[in-house]
């Protein structure tokens, strides 16, 4: 466990520079955080940025304090299984915050972990910018009061979140959804499309957490087998999340005639090339929607996690696409419904039923409109620099 985290030696810290720490606990946060780091260092090359995240933050230029790849979990029982890792990371990062003389702490999503860090930062007078806020509109709305006490400013990615935080007295700004920033940099890469052109292509996105992959990928593979029998020309592409090891995928993949190609680091290219996607619930549903691809949402957690979630969650849908739309735009297969036969049936309906597919595409266009305009990372970076200037 200890090798997952690396505390920077205090004596080697950057001196004479403004210092920012950015904390991202999951693959999506690592991605969006990396864009903020790039914008920050472009706008102010004199900044020194520390990071808690994974490979993308590192590549963007952050000096890594801890690797978050072992922290990402989904569900109540999964949290208990990783509690040792979470606590080890928390104590090390807290210690760093207390000693480092940060000018600003930027927190990205990952609320239970990050709100604890926020309290530690409050104790040493480090201002906090929260980017991609906790989904208080879905569950545990009482966290709004905690956020209002601990966070100086919040950058939200859904327009309907503004009123929630304003009513709590928070300084809040809608910056647009960060996924919109990714379109221009990915649309020109046609390698996968040229490779697969002419065949029905289905993207399989089983999630960015090991637990998700373990529960969903076997059912997606079973669906692929059924679809191959129904559509002999069908092909499948599985973009691998950076937080998932290839060994975790290989044990679930068939070694027979089902044509599943695994690619690394090309999620958006894979989605652009695909005719549709089977997607684990979460941010990936919005990625798929922004790229205008029909989808089937599959969702599985432990029975206890699901039971607790259903008792606490206040929204009607699991998928962010449907939540943003305020209605059912794409099908959701939850728990026992997320099995190969049902997934295959929904995929076939999208492929074969043109009116149904067109109606879904219209709904996805509405969702994209509600997500704002590109430039979220730049806006967040400018907010951060303004907060540092105001701090003095």
Model regions and ranges:
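Nucleotide-activated sugar donor-binding and catalytic core shared by glycosyltransferases
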Residues: 3-4, 9-392
